[in-house]
């Protein structure tokens, strides 16, 4: 689209008779959309991870819109607002991403027209490379120079961004504005991010606040699941809510299964530790019994052989052979005691005591 086409379109709009002045809005929108579609190739050149200032076509589009008489009032990450002398007291907002959270908020505004804080939406359309919204012309928020602007900006930021309830005691129009902020928070919670800074609230000439764009953009290529039709938006929000419930249920199931598996793992480990402890105690008891038995065998062998002979054998024999010898001597000693008990004879210990105490 060149400057000649633009000027011809402007001349055609200016030439409209008084009875057809209501067509100006639609013709200006068509002209602006045609310039956007021409520069962005119907949105194909729009990079979703870049701000407008970093788009290759942005500078050229600014020049074309300025040549057509459009005045850019400001721009966000994916949208810009324009005014035109042929459309007084109105602003055309252009969203360069056909379906995003801004379009969803526009549909929300259409659903709740007339509520305090909700801007008036006179027209909304989706095009090949963008969407357009016609709104009232509003003033920027002078947060630090106007007490009323500061108050309403704080209320909107506290409720929408932080879900605060410190303003619940407000009544009258302010109370209705608080309820609108809560409604926005409830409607978009979980499906969009909130970005309620002072640039997203504007004021009329009478300092009436209007929340213009409290939800932030998405970088998904398909533009997200938002629509500019209210009924479709409600269905999509309900679907998102259902999907959120499903995701929460799946997450609960995963956590439950994780806890069950953790309990099974702890139970297996507890049983294994208990079995290992019992085995260790059995092995320790067997080792202690064997050690005491070896000591008893040694004492019996010393009594039978004498301490000197036992020591000489210990020196001249391998340790295994010496231990086996002491076991055989102790076994013979015990068997002899059993035979003595069976035959009513004196025990070996009695013989030792007789020898020790004799005389």
Swiss-Prot record:
InterPro entries: Protein_kinase_T7-type
Sites bearing Phosphoserine, chain numbering: 216
This enzyme's EC code(s): 2.7.11.1
The keyword Magnesium is annotated on this UniProt entry: no
Keyword line: ATP-binding, Bacterial host gene expression shutoff by virus, Bacterial host transcription shutoff by virus, Coiled coil, Host gene expression shutoff by virus, Host-virus interaction, Kinase, Nucleotide-binding, Phosphoprotein, Serine/threonine-protein kinase, Transferase
Annotated transmembrane regions: none
Molecular function per GO: ATP binding; protein serine kinase activity; protein serine/threonine kinase activity
Highest taxon of the lineage: Viruses
Disulfide bonds: none
Residues in coiled coil: 231-283
Catalyzed reactions: L-seryl-[protein] + ATP = O-phospho-L-seryl-[protein] + ADP + H(+); L-threonyl-[protein] + ATP = O-phospho-L-threonyl-[protein] + ADP + H(+)
Keyword Coiled coil among UniProt keywords: yes
GO biological process, alphabetically ordered: symbiont-mediated suppression of host gene expression
Function: Serine/threonine kinase that modulates host metabolism to favor virus replication cycle. Participates together with gene 2 protein (gp2) in the host transcription shutoff. Phosphorylates host RNA polymerase subunit RpoC and to a lesser extent subunit RpoB. This modification seems to increase rho-dependent transcription termination, which may help to switch from host to viral RNA polymerase transcription during phage development. Phosphorylates host components of the RNA degradosome rne and RhlB, leading to stabilization of mRNAs synthesized by T7 RNA polymerase.
Protein's recorded name: Protein kinase 0.7
Organism this protein belongs to: Escherichia phage T7 (Bacteriophage T7)
């Amino acid at each position: 689209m060149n400057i000649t086409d633009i000027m011809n379109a402007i001349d055609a709009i200016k030439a409209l008779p008084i009875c057809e002045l209501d067509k100006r809005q639609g013709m200006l929108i068509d002209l602006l959309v045609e310039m956007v579609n021409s520069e962005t190739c119907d949105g194909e050149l729009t990079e979703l991870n870049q701000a407008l200032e970093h788009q290759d076509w942005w500078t050229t589009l600014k020049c074309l819109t300025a040549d057509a008489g459009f005045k850019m009032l400001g721009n966000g990450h994916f949208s810009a607002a324009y005014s035109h002398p042929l459309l007084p007291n109105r602003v055309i907002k252009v969203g360069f991403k056909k379906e995003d959270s801004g379009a969803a908020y526009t549909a929300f505004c259409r659903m709740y027209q007339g509520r305090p804080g909700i801007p008036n939406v006179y027209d909304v359309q989706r095009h090949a490379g963008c969407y357009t919204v016609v709104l009232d012309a509003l003033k920027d928020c002078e947060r630090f120079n106007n007490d009323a602007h500061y108050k309403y900006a704080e209320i909107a930021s506290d409720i929408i961004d932080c879900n605060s309830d410190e303003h619940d005691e407000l009544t009258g129009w302010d109370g209705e504005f608080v309820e609108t902020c809560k409604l926005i928070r409830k409607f978009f919670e979980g499906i969009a991010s909130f970005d309620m800074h002072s640039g997203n609230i504007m004021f009329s000439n009478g300092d009436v606040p209007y929340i213009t764009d409290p939800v932030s953009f998405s970088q998904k290529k398909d533009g997200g699941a938002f629509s500019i039709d209210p009924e479709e938006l409600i269905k999509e929000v309900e679907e998102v809510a259902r999907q959120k419930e499903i995701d929460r249920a799946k997450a609960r199931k995963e956590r439950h299964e994780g806890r069950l598996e953790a309990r099974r793992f702890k139970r297996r480990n507890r049983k294994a530790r208990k079995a290992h402890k019992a085995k260790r105690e059995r092995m320790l008891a067997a080792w202690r019994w064997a050690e005491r038995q070896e000591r008893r065998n040694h004492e019996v062998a010393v009594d039978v052989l004498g301490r000197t002979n036992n020591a000489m054998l210990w020196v001249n024999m391998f340790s295994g052979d010496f231990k086996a010898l002491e076991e055989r001597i102790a076994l013979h000693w015990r068997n002899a005691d059993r035979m003595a008990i069976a035959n009513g004879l004196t025990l070996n210990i009695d013989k030792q005591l007789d020898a020790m105490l004799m005389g």
